[in-house]
Amino acid sequence: MKINQPIETNYTLSCPVNIALLTDFHNSDPEPVLESLQRRRPEIITVAGDLILGDLPGKKGLKIDENRHAVELLRGCAALAPTFVSLGNHEYMLSEADLKIVRSTGATLLDNTHVSHQGMVIGGLSSAYCHVYRTFRQQHSGEGMYPPIPITELKKRQIPQLGWLDEFEQQDGFRLLLCHHPDYYPLYLRERKIDLIFSGHCHGGQWRFYSPIHGETRGVFAPGQGFFPKLTSGVHDGKLVISKGLCNTTFIPRINNPTEIVYITNR
């Protein structure tokens, strides 16, 4: 899948290092992304979910093998700078064998966990889809590595695993959280002691138009938020950064909504 040349969106925030934020790559063309990263040379690269293009479970072979461009992107990123990856809803079916390949790229996988890096603490909150499907897989272990799950089963009980965040927010240092779903922010994250949160998921609201009521350009629809969502791009409360993403996964075109790489520079 080809992507148009992404725009480079720049935000200046209180942050110890310069960071690139990638989201919603969906196994597309890594070349324009890596070209931008090679030119900009961020100190850290973050991938906040939906690295792959998800599919219904049931095909033969590893899911990650169907997403070779995603693996290529991670290897390219890890060769440029320390790279940290969290899991979005499109990664829900990945098995431990799949995740082993993700780790083999040199990127650090953050699956409801955190690591320390140069005075920072970087965590990754996995999509609730991952937990739902892992539970389902255990209950249907005799049906292969990727037992098919009814969509109604997948979408119920959509609560991420939050317990580890209590320890995360008590860590010393600048706390950066990768969380694919921006709709988790008002529900679970706003009041936590987290310095910066990186999200994506909404593809910028698909169609973006100027709202005279709000005095800004806003998206039309986002999963998890519905029509005229509030959280589709930009910086919110000085701590939630949302990327419009790198790809499109639907036949509905993006209108007034270019793909983007977000660069965070420190004040």
Identify the role of each PLM range:
Residues 1-20, 25-26:
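Acidic, histidine-bearing metal-coordination/catalytic regions of metal-dependent phosphoesterases
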Residues 11-20, 107, 114-127, 170-174, ...:
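Beta-strand-turn-beta hairpins that frame and shape the catalytic cleft
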Residues 55-56, 118-121, 133, 206-213, ...:
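Short, charged, surface-exposed secondary-structure boundary motifs
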